[in-house]
From Swiss-Prot:
Modification sites for Phosphoserine: S14
Membrane topology annotation: Lipid-anchor
Record bears the keyword Phosphoprotein: yes
Predominant place of localization: membrane
Tissue: Testis specific.
InterPro entries cross-referenced by the UniProt entry: DnaJ_C_subfamily_member5, DnaJ_domain, DnaJ_domain_CS, J_dom_sf
Cellular compartment(s): Membrane
Species of provenance: Homo sapiens (Human)
GO cellular component assignments: cytoplasm; membrane
Protein known as: DnaJ homolog subfamily C member 5B
Keywords annotated in UniProt: Chaperone, Lipoprotein, Membrane, Palmitate, Phosphoprotein
Gene: DNAJC5B
Length: 199
């Protein structure tokens, strides 16, 4: 069974950021007004309704629309101008705000720094010990400035404290218990609200 591989060449991602300008026939750095004018002219020329029998015109129209959509969006245009279509692909995958971070971390010096730090720390083993295990399960951790106190309360002391608290709070006994609520009971009575216990 043979695989059906299309003869169409897979489009490569550029890093120069000039192809969309070339589609519209503009120079890199063209103003928004120039982009709009050229887009209108080319869109009318290659519109599928004006060229119903020409599939190449339809494809050209799609390319023109895509170029216009990217070049009129300020953030996409700045990413495209700086990083090309590869930058747009990264923005689609990781978000517009993470494009600079992605290219910074994929640079040769960031990779070299990662390898050097990894070698110096024994494949990050000592970082693991310090951060995760607090250096040998806490045996090597620094002494804290606040001394730890043992809080042991004997049952007799706790019982005396509870009795003294109960004696202080026995000023006003409860005379009336709340009524049971059901589905027909209103949560708030009509009329004035009173938060006092005296009636």
């Amino acid at each position: 069974m043979a695989c059906n591989i299309p003869n169409q060449r897979q489009r490569t991602l550029s890093t120069t950021g000039e192809a969309l300008y070339e589609i519209l026939g503009l120079h890199k750095g063209a103003s928004n007004e120039e982009i709009k004018k050229t887009y209108r002219k080319l869109a009318l020329k290659h519109h599928p309704d004006k060229n119903p029998d020409d599939p190449a015109a339809t494809e050209k129209f799609k390319e023109i629309n895509n170029a216009h959509a990217i070049l009129t969006d300020i953030s996409k245009r700045s990413i495209y101008d700086k990083y090309g279509s590869l930058g747009l692909y990264v923005a689609e995958q990781f978000g517009d705000e993470n494009v600079n971070t992605y290219f910074m971390l994929s640079s040769w010096w960031a990779k070299a720094l990662f390898v050097i730090v990894g070698l110096l720390t024994g494949c990050y083993f000592c970082c693991c010990l310090c951060c995760c295990c607090n250096c040998c399960c806490g045996h090597c951790r620094p002494e804290s400035s606040v001394p730890e106190e043992d809080f042991y309360v004997s049952p007799e002391d706790l019982e005396e404290q509870i009795k003294s608290d109960m004696e202080k709070d026995v000023d006003f006994p409860v005379f009336l218990q709340p009524t049971n609520a059901n589905e027909k009971t209103q949560l708030i009575k009509e009329g004035s609200r009173s938060y006092c216990t005296d009636s």
